[in-house]
């Protein structure tokens, strides 16, 4: 549903408001590119960007991953891989209504108000076109909420929307991160 063009204005606004360097990743999308193509693109991009930090005027000690919806899952996966030293270190993550559980078993999935674009049916459609099997559905890289060890992650900010079918996933991820002793800031917006 989103791409570089749809998120350009938000990225520019964040850049202006925070005086930070914002780099948006144009990762491969399904159905043309199935799991784990988006993860591979994201990880390759993070590694390349951090390795060229001086060129991009980036302080390597202030790199934060951010994403919304499926991009929130990619940011979460990148943060976990950073902790495991599979990619360069990141220092925080911002997850905006993250889609972190491809099993789609949370109660908020049943939120289906008239006129909403995102509902369980559309989410199932996206998942069916992204994943090849149940094994991929429960793979921690597709469902970071199911990661066995979520300890020692950098500070996390999670934003949820009360009428979003993904709201319970963000809340569940918050609770799991807290149970592992991580610093988590959570804000739920009405609507």
List the predicted regions and their residue ranges.
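Alpha/beta-hydrolase superfamily serine-hydrolase fold, recognizing
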Residues: 1-191
